[in-house]
Amino acid sequence: MNPAIFTTIILTMILGTMIVTTSSHWLTVWIGFEMNMLAIIPILMKKYNPRSMEASTKYFLTQATASMLLMLAITINLVYSGQWSVTKPLTPMASITMTLAMAMKLGLSPFHFWVPEVTQGTQLSSGLILLTWQKLAPMSILYQISPTINLELLLMMAILSIAIGGWGGLNQTQLRKIMAYSSIAHMGWMTAIMAYNPAMTLLNLXVYILLTTTXFMMLMLNSSTTTLSLSHTWNKTPLLATTILLIMLSLGGLPPLSGFXPKWMIIQEMTKNDSIIMPTIMAMAALLNLYFYMRLTYSTSLTMFPSTNNMKMKWQFNSTKPMTYISPLIILSTLXLPLSPMLTLLE
């Protein structure tokens, strides 16, 4: 793709998200979503092949349906309240329709079917944008409508997302699909706390984006897309392979890594609000995620796949790929929770 065109597309995508997050008028919110959707489709098709074409078509159809639901919610709200303002409370019917539209855009269950397929059909760099940047705009709308949101609907989708995010990843060997199912589960945790403490949702989103970005960047560094190619990383760069696996465990929420902090805080917040059964079910469902990440760690580091002698000698050669920008991400992705008590010393 022409660099000038690619830069324009990226800027349009960023502008679309910024319009959504900063708008106070529902029509400009819808325009921002459309700009964002139309800009990311060429990014998904960057490597032109039938698989990426299929992925971008699935993404377009899903997002177009979600945009239609969004416009329906805006129209219902306009008819019953006469308001275009984002800051004004939504009517109950408009709130439910808006929540469903945002759930479809985020890939929450039961609207999750497109996420693994689209992520698997694209390059790692496109998958990174899809699972991180594309979550910002819908999450900002959910944050703004959180006072009028339907609690039962939100909690039902959250529980389903956490459970399906765990079950779906159990039998996967493709790393992009594993990351996609992990994303579905993380979205479930974020929406579960949305009605209780919206600010905690933003904290969870920030940690999720940090962990997912680090994991994708390290997979891009090794060109790893399957568990088999990840296991060969152990022969080439053992230290890098160890770091990848630590980040995977952090994504699974294993204490004392960074990924455990938001889950811990969400369970604590829900318990304070006299909700005991919900966080218990969520914690049990999250064990599925942790299980497939631990199985990935075991198969990669504690077992050795058949390989040639030449492959076993690669660790002796220095890697020429730049790693300076990844180092701070690795530290934040693994050590934010252990180091966080030390922040009190700065006060």
Curated annotation (Swiss-Prot):
Transmembrane segments: 1-21, 25-45, 59-79, 96-116, 127-147, 149-169, 178-198, 201-221, 240-260, 274-294, 326-346
GO biological process: mitochondrial electron transport, NADH to ubiquinone; mitochondrial respiratory chain complex I assembly
Entry annotated with the keyword Transport: yes
Catalytic activity: a ubiquinone + NADH + 5 H(+)(in) = a ubiquinol + NAD(+) + 4 H(+)(out)
Keyword NAD set for record: yes
UniProt cross-references to InterPro entries, sorted A to Z: Complex_I_Subunit_2 (IPR050175), NADH_DH_su2_C (IPR010933), NADH_UbQ_OxRdtase_chain2 (IPR003917), ND/Mrp_TM (IPR001750)
Membrane topology according to the record: Multi-pass membrane protein
EC number of this enzyme: 7.1.1.2
Top-level class of the enzyme under EC nomenclature: translocase
Location within or outside the cell: Mitochondrion inner membrane
Main localization, broad class: mitochondrion
Gene Ontology cellular component annotations, sorted alphabetically: mitochondrial inner membrane
Pfam families: NADH_dehy_S2_C, Proton_antipo_M
Keywords annotated in UniProt: Electron transport, Membrane, Mitochondrion, Mitochondrion inner membrane, NAD, Respiratory chain, Translocase, Transmembrane, Transmembrane helix, Transport, Ubiquinone
Molecular function per GO: NADH dehydrogenase (ubiquinone) activity
Family indicated by similarity: Belongs to the complex I subunit 2 family.
Subunit structure: Core subunit of respiratory chain NADH dehydrogenase (Complex I) which is composed of 45 different subunits. Interacts with TMEM242.
Record function comment: Core subunit of the mitochondrial membrane respiratory chain NADH dehydrogenase (Complex I) which catalyzes electron transfer from NADH through the respiratory chain, using ubiquinone as an electron acceptor. Essential for the catalytic activity and assembly of complex I.
The name this protein goes by in its record: NADH-ubiquinone oxidoreductase chain 2
